[in-house]
């Protein structure tokens, strides 16, 4: 009897150890990985030894395991698992975060959000062909835009001395140049009386 009792105790201890190991691998992939892996409750999620979280899911009918990627947090990995589970198992999928079903962004864009080129617009999308102003408001919109743009322009332009330009123009026509403050108007009398031969060349185009 004494030799049988130790064997029974050893068999019982081995069964208990195997039970603990089997239970540690249910749900979240526990039993290995980073320090927070043991406390993870998300299905298909585990932590690497360097702290990153990974997610994977098995195909229906005990198929192959699909790798879903590496994530910074366990929640991100759980959301990735839920997204894949909805595609593989449909509405019957067991989700980690069912309350986040609506808030989680869709991986594929919906048909309504896609813009298709129109034959009437020469391949341009509808967003490109739309104008910020309607046809009846185009003129008012342009005026408002011009007023706003000129209102915010504050440039200190330099003051130009254009006296030399006017002097050169009058000399080319044969007129005397009168400087500011010059009260001698005798030269204008000469111009009026026909003293300058170029006066006839200065005529109206009409």
From Swiss-Prot:
Taxonomic superkingdom: Eukaryota
Primary location group: nucleus
GO molecular function list: DNA-binding transcription factor activity; transcription cis-regulatory region binding
UniProt cross-references to SMART domains, sorted A to Z: AP2
Transmembrane segments: none
Induction and repression of expression: By high-salt stress.
Compartment annotation: Nucleus
A single GO cellular-component term on record: nucleus
Its job: Putative transcriptional activator that binds specifically to the DNA sequence 5'-[AG]CCGAC-3'. Binding to the C-repeat/DRE element mediates high salinity-inducible transcription.
Assigned protein family: Belongs to the AP2/ERF transcription factor family. ERF subfamily.
Protein name: Dehydration-responsive element-binding protein 2D
């Amino acid at each position: 009897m004494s030799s049988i009792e130790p064997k029974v105790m050893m068999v019982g201890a081995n069964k208990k150890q195997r039970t603990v190991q089997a239970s540690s691998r249910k749900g979240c992939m526990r039993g290995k990985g980073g320090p927070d892996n043991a406390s993870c409750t998300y299905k298909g999620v585990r932590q690497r030894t360097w702290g990153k979280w990974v997610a994977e899911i098995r195909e229906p009918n005990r198929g192959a395991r699909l790798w879903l990627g590496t994530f910074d947090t366990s929640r991100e990995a759980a959301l990735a698992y839920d997204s894949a589970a909805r595609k593989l198992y449909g509405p019957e999928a067991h989700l980690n975060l069912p309350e986040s079903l609506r808030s989680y962004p869709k991986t594929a864009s919906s048909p309504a959000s896609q813009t298709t080129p129109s034959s009437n617009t020469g391949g341009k999308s509808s967003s490109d062909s739309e104008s910020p102003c309607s046809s009846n408001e185009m003129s008012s919109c342009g005026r408002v835009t011009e007023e706003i743009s000129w209102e915010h322009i504050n440039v200190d332009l330099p003051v130009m001395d254009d006296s030399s330009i006017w002097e050169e123009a009058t000399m080319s026509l044969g007129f005397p140049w009168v400087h500011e403050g010059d009260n001698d108007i005798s030269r204008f009398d000469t111009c009026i009386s026909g003293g300058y031969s170029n006066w006839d060349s200065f005529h109206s185009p009409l």
